[in-house]
Amino acid sequence: VNLGLARIQRLMFLLGDPQKKYKTIHVTGTNGKGSVTAMLASCLQAAGIRTGMYISPHLSSYTERMVIDGQPVSKQQFAETLSVVRDICEFMQGEGDEHPTQFEVLTAAAFLLFQKAGVEYAVIEVGLGGLLDSTNVIVPEVSVITNVTFEHADKCGGTLEGIATHK
């Protein structure tokens, strides 16, 4: 798999760039990303703002990764949205593009689900790294960095500064 944003950027473009239809908060760091993401989403929701939340990994079901106003998306919503994304992925392959990764497909599905649900804000947790992570197709209103340690040093640079740059 080639690291980079080209596949997810193309996929999002073909889906109509749903991630540009609402405001986003991007959360990265080594530890605490999921907790910070959940707290921010909860605060927005408590303020009466329709809110999406995207986290990874899940514990028991893929639908846990995509939350709207505190509730995981339904299996039906998830399946219908994945079907749309799958069709675009097949079109991309037919055009000679590399098939998006599983995480790219899930990220695209989350962003499309949030648009369809009419969220005002989506709080997005980075998957791996940051710089080349597929969630980086968003242009966030706010970026949050929790603590940074030597996690993923092989992929994000061998120094703390290199890792911080990636995150």
Give residue spans per PLM region.
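ATP-dependent carboxylate-amine ligase catalytic core
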Residues: 5, 9-20, 46-138, 150-164
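Conserved beta-strand/loop subsegment of P-loop NTPase cores
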Residues: 142-149
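A conserved segment at the C-terminal end of the G1
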Residues: 23, 27, 35-52
